[in-house]
Amino acid sequence: KSYLALVGSLGFALSPLVIIWSRTAVSDSLLCGTVGISLLLFWRKFFENKSKNCISPWIFLSLAILTKGPVAAIIVALTLAIFLSTQDDRKRLLLKIKPLQGILITFLVSTPWYLIVFLKEGQSFFDSFFGYHNLQRYTTVVNNHSEPWWFFIFIMTIGSLPFSIFLFHGIFETIKE
């Protein structure tokens, strides 16, 4: 079953929605990439036996924060918290990623850009970027998008054709077993 990762990657990369969305110059793909690499590097750090520095996952988290803002830190923190809550040796695993050192690295890499832009653009940048793009978008309806939460299941199913057919096939096969 070593081919499953390749098939899954190709199914994602060749989905119409991903192809169309990647051509619109929206930073979501870059956010997904940097968050994904950060999480992969954290996972590798959890399970390697060497106890060297843990810098690279934090650098990629910093790049994700530079890409889309604090939402990247929230996504990574929630993912790590959920993962660690399922592990018996969560304290040892948490210490392997050196969270205090990592938060400092993340802060040192991502903060200077935000400070420079804030000094140049002033309060309007803060209000627009943090207030609108990072708070309102995730807590309220913006741009008159009032579709219910399940609407996006439909969009993802259509946007992932023809590969979404295999998802439903897999779900039905699992239920039958």
Segments predicted by a language model, with ranges:
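Membrane-integral, polyisoprenol-dependent glycosyltransferases
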Residues: 1-177
